[in-house]
């Protein structure tokens, strides 16, 4: 018995300590709850109610504040196009309090920036800044810092990366690739003509050495959508010249010829950047040549050497090219992102990150 007494005393002492701690914890929680109940403001109460609405939603609700360029998309397409389930897209701003995500297109933000700065935001809601234009073609707006939680753009270091297109493995559903019939050597379709653009200066020199079939608003030869793809497909080479040069900025000017069975001749970021997203032997980079004249000689050589030309399509044995769905894909990929990433943060330096 003597040996057991110290053990019993320790047990009793431990129980007393636990009871005291429990009582103290209850007091703290009860006091905090009572204080919150009496001092909570109307704005805080509305915010908590909004958070409750969000928690009650079974699907992830994505509110597209305004469809980019007014092009409304079918809102049930996340599962159909991208196999992303559990997402509900809406453009009804009355569902703001229920939305897990609110998407804002940069080009439209200037219209209601002052309104955004004043808007009450539900506790669990995330705002996504969406942009597919380069910094040169995006208005730099004040007060974007500390406003958004996530970024969705063509840049590969965005939170949600949405390129203009993708190279994907060819499936059984894809038809065996055959190079389309070609009756033109080099083509270019362009609307935005600016003598200060590098692409215009390069084109002006290149056309001195090789015939280029030109189309688009800049040449007063507009094409319908059907004519557009048919024209690209009929050319051996297509000038995929970007209007501005930034890392990761390769647009539909690159992916449309890849999808159409044409070899893109690219002017944009360095070759190494392109090779991070498309096969190295699927395109020609203007930087591969010392001058436009040297490039022209290479194109004319390829015109006379079918076997060498066909090597640009070796990758099509295993892969194919797909376009993205502007606006819709941003919304669906953002939904997928927050379903897999629950952490909450605020983007502190969006302006510096994007415009430098």
Predicted features along the sequence, with ranges:
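A short, histidine- and acid-enriched strand-loop-helix "catalytic/donor-clamping" loop
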Residues: 133-136
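Pol beta-like nucleotidyltransferase catalytic core
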Residues: 2-129, 139-356
């Amino acid at each position: 018995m003597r040996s057991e007494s110290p053990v019993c005393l320790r047990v009793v002492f431990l129980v007393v300590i636990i009871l005291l701690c429990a009582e103290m914890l209850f007091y703290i929680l009860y006091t905090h709850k009572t204080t919150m109940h009496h001092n909570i403001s109307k704005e805080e109460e509305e915010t908590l109610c909004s958070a409750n609405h969000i928690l009650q939603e079974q699907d992830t609700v994505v509110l597209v504040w305004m469809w980019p360029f007014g092009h409304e998309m079918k809102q049930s397409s996340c599962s159909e196009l991208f196999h992303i389930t559990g997402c509900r897209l809406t453009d009804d701003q009355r569902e703001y309090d229920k939305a897990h995500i609110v998407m804002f297109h940069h080009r439209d933000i200037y219209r209601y920036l002052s309104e955004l700065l004043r808007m009450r935001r539900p506790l669990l809601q995330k705002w996504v800044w969406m942009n597919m234009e380069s910094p040169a073609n995006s208005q730099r707006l004040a007060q974007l810092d500390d406003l958004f939680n996530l970024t969705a753009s063509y840049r590969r270091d965005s939170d949600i990366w949405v390129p203009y297109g993708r190279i994907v493995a060819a499936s059984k559903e894809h038809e065996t690739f055959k190079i389309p019939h070609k009756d033109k050597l080099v083509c270019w379709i362009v609307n935005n003509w600016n003598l200060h653009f590098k692409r215009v200066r390069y084109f002006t020199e290149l056309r001195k050495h090789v015939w280029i079939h030109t189309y688009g608003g800049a040449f007063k030869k507009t094409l319908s959508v059907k004519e557009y793809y048919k024209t690209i497909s009929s050319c051996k080479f297509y000038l995929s010249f970007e209007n501005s040069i930034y890392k990761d900025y390769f647009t539909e000017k690159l992916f449309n010829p890849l999808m159409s069975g044409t070899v893109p001749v690219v002017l944009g970021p360095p070759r190494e950047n392109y090779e991070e997203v498309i096969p190295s032997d699927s395109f020609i980079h203007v930087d591969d040549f010392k001058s436009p004249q040297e490039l022209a000689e290479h194109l004319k050589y390829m015109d006379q050497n079918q076997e060498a030309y066909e090597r640009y399509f070796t990758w099509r044995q295993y892969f194919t090219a797909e376009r993205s769905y502007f606006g819709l894909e941003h919304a669906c990929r953002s939904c997928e992102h927050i379903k897999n990433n629950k952490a909450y943060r605020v983007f502190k330096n969006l302006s510096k990150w994007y415009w430098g």
